[in-house]
Each structure stands twice: as structure tokens, then as C-alpha cells.
Amino acid sequence: MVQAIKLSELGNRKRRNDPVNEDEESEIDISSTDSEEENAGDEEQEIVNIDFDFFDGNPDVDFHAVKHLIRQLLGPQESNRVQLSALSDLILSSPTTTIKTDGKESDPYCFLSFINYKENKDSDYAKYLRKLDTRIETFLQTLDNTGNKSCALVMSERLINMPPEVVTPLYRITMEDAAAANEGKPFDFYVIVSRKYEVNFDMDEAEGDASARSKKRVRGKSEVDYFHEEDRFFEKHAKVHFDGESKKGLIASYIIIDHDSLVKSINEFEQEVSTW
């Protein structure tokens, strides 16, 4: 059953998607204002209101949009190492939350999915993760050997202009759904794949000679920023986190975090966003 929630409800629970309420106006306004003029207070400001609804992942509607967002998350090179269609199917068969603005039949602007590692450890994506880095391989192998700890493979991506206010309810909803699917128990650990970017990356220079690329790497080594601001907080409390090599300005990011630390990170992120 497709469900939705208003952003104003802060995402603690999903509400039933009653057809008679599909056109109901959301109570939250995510607004942007033009305040460039010094005397903007004396002028009429333009306000753009956007209503965001949270839905369960829908294989019949969301497949192609989720596949596109996965490709955006992994980047052009890593995407070629993963079976994207199979991964999209896996995501949409797992506890997944999407965010839309034009009703349940529209394309999602954002998704967050918790893939049960134990149930899908033989999937193409799990095999891909084990080959990425010995730290991930060792962690997953430990889970396989002990057998008494659960783990979610977390995938999340969104359009670049999505407001950060959606992140906290997005995670809380999906954690609640994942626990409900596991007899009320949350996952013990989460393996999060994300991405960063080189702030000063120059595509023209990247296409030049090798020495130019090498010099650029040295100059821009510390000039790295986050696509997902919440990753700063995840890394702060992570058991393990590391970055991959820069590929045309894109840097893969990997985080292993336990449940309590994930909850703490989300709470801290919510508090930080409230001050922006």
C-alpha cells in the first residue's frame, strides 16, 4: 500500500494515502526568497512554496527514477561495475522511502533504502561492496561468521536542490519501516555509500596532460565538500569511514556506523539544520 506523510508532521509516521485527500494542501512551506536588495523589507518578496510528500517505494512507478538516482550516486565509472536494474529492483523490494511533489504516480526527487544484508548477501550489489575495499570486506565477513548481528546496506540519493529539512524525517520513517519488517528490531549496523566532490576541480584541466592533473590533485587535496550534509555527522560517529579515489572530481564515501550512533547523528543533524 502506498502511503504518504506531510513534511509538517516531521516524519515520525506515515499516514494512509486516502484518495480523497490526494489534493490536500501540505501544511509546510519550503520557501525561497529574493533578498539581494538592501531595502528588501520595503519591497514585495517572491515566495515559492513546494509541498513534499513521503511515499513507500513503488516498483511500478519508481524503477527508472531510482535507477537514474543510483547512477548519479555512484558516478559514471562505478555505475558500470554494478547491475543497476537488479539494484533498483532490490531497493524497491526493501524498506524504501521516496519523496515526491506531484503525487504518488510522479517520479521521486529523493529516495532512501535499507537493504537487508543477511537476506541479500549473494546479490550483485553485496558482492560489489565486498570487492571495493578490504575494510568493508572484513566487516561483512565478520557479520557472516558471527551471524548474530544485522546490517543494512544503505543507499540514498536526491536531487541537488532538495532542502536539508527532509533528511531527518526521511531517515526516521525508513528506520521505522525497517524495524517493522524485522519484528520491531532495528538493524545493528549500517553500511552507507555516499559521495563528495572536489570544490576546485577543473574538468578542462582534467582532460589535459597527466602532469596537469597531478598538480591539480595537490592543490585541491583539502578542497572537498559533501553532497549530503548529513554525512559530516555520520562520519563523526562512524566505526569506520573512508573515501575512494577522486574520479573526475567525484569522490566515493563509505561509512560503517552502528544503530545508536546513526540515531545520534540524525538528531545532531536536525539540531544543526534548525539553526540555518
Curated annotation (Swiss-Prot):
Localization per Swiss-Prot or TrEMBL: Cytoplasm; Nucleus
Chain spans, region Disordered: 1-43
Keywords: Cytoplasm, Nucleus, Protein transport, Transport
Main localization, broad class: cytoplasm
InterPro entries xref list: BCP1_family
A GO CC annotation given for this chain: nucleus
Superkingdom of the organism of origin: Eukaryota
A Pfam cross-reference name: BCCIP
Cited function: Involved in nuclear export, actin cytoskeleton organization and vesicular transport.
Family, similarity comment: Belongs to the BCP1 family.
PANTHER family (alphabetical): BRCA2 AND CDKN1A INTERACTING PROTEIN, BRCA2 AND CDKN1A-INTERACTING PROTEIN
Protein's name in the database: Protein BCP1
Organism of this sequence: Candida glabrata (strain ATCC 2001 / BCRC 20586 / JCM 3761 / NBRC 0622 / NRRL Y-65 / CBS 138) (Yeast)
Species classification: Eukaryota, Fungi, Dikarya, Ascomycota, Saccharomycotina
